[in-house]
Swiss-Prot record:
Residues 1-61 form a transit peptide. The lineage of its organism: Eukaryota, Metazoa, Chordata, Craniata, Vertebrata. This is Enoyl-CoA hydratase domain-containing protein 3, mitochondrial. InterPro entries: ClpP/crotonase-like_dom_sf, Enoyl-CoA_hydra/iso, Enoyl-CoA_hydra_C, Mitochondrial_ECH-domain. It comes from the Eukaryota. Keywords: Fatty acid metabolism, Lipid metabolism, Mitochondrion, Transit peptide. One of its GO terms (biological process) is fatty acid metabolic process. Belongs to the enoyl-CoA hydratase/isomerase family. GO terms for molecular function: hydro-lyase activity. It is found in: Mitochondrion.
Length: 294
């Protein structure tokens, strides 16, 4: 059971397809396979772009504790690899993620297990901002509760026009307090509170209007547009992007004066980098930069 039922969404279709795993291996997922033999997440990597697929559509890609741990493991896998430039998080089926598995939140699991669920999830969400590479959510379908939190926590989010977003915990007696942390930092306060108080879903276009997602595209263009953005990032300097991302989140937590002080210092630091000087020289010389990622 997951948050999705409070939104009336139908069960996602069965698993299907073949996925290329890191290092060129492949695994066929048969629709008749038992769940215990099916990976909760699937990791692919090519040309510096890592795609992590939430792979449990029968359970609406619920963020159970094992799912959270699997996602975290895939994100941290060789995270310092200089060839890794972008991470994309997508999902199999017509639900991006329905949030926490409500069966794990019943009394028989106990308080300690509940704390482990929420603490592990919080570490995952904060991990996105500490990674040196951008993280993109590719959303197709419904994202509710912790699933909506996941979208809000990513650096960039591209959604299909069929996507919807909600924090419906209030309707089952469990306020979406942890999703509210990410949601409240992604959209205006009054929009966040209306979503949290009512549990009503918003459309992809409203999510774009309020800043929860970066872009909305037709469903058939979702993957190509997400890949286009990822490839564009791959054309930049790894070290410059890493510095810029870290600085952006650091300055957001500071006062206006302190933020400008920090970023002024970082701009000077950036100029001292090899790629900082290479970029300026290439612009003046009207040629493409040759990045050394240093």
């Amino acid at each position: 059971m997951s948050w999705l039922r409070s939104c009336g969404e139908r069960t996602a279709p069965a698993l299907r397809g073949t996925y290329r795993i890191l290092a060129g291996q492949s695994r066929f997922v048969n629709s008749s396979s038992h769940l215990q033999h099916t990976p909760l997440t699937v990791l692919q990597q090519e040309h510096g772009i890592r795609r992590i697929i939430l792979n449990n559509p029968q359970q609406r890609n619920a963020l159970s504790l094992p799912m959270i741990q699997s996602l975290q493991k895939d994100i941290l896998h060789e995270a310092d690899d200089p060839n890794l430039r972008v991470i994309i998080i997508s999902a199999e089926g017509n639900v991006f993620s329905s949030g926490h598995n409500l069966k794990e939140l019943t009394a028989e699991y106990g308080k300690d297990y509940h704390m482990e669920v929420f603490n592990t999830c919080a570490k995952l969400m904060t991990l996105f901002q500490t990674l040196p590479v951008p993280v993109i959510a590719e959303v197709n379908g419904l994202a509710t509760a912790a699933g909506c939190q996941l979208v809000a926590s990513c650096d960039i989010a591209v959604a299909s026009d069929k996507s919807r977003f909600a924090t419906p915990g209030v309707n089952v007696g469990l306020f979406c307090s942890t999703p509210g942390v990410a949601l409240g930092r992604a959209v205006p306060r009054k929009v966040a509170l209306e979503m949290l108080f009512t549990g009503e879903p918003i459309s992809a276009h409203d999510a774009l209007l309020h800043g929860l997602v970066s872009k909305v595209v037709p469903e058939e263009n979702l993957k190509s547009e997400t890949n286009r953005i990822a490839l564009k990032i791959c054309q930049t300097s790894h070290s410059v992007v890493a510095l810029g991302k870290s600085t952006f989140y650091r300055q957001m937590a500071k006062s206006l004066t302190d933020a400008y002080k920090l970023t002024s210092e970082v701009m000077v630091e950036n100029l001292a980098m090899k790629d900082g000087q290479e970029g300026l020289k290439s612009f003046i010389q009207k040629r493409k930069p040759v990045w050394t990622h240093s």
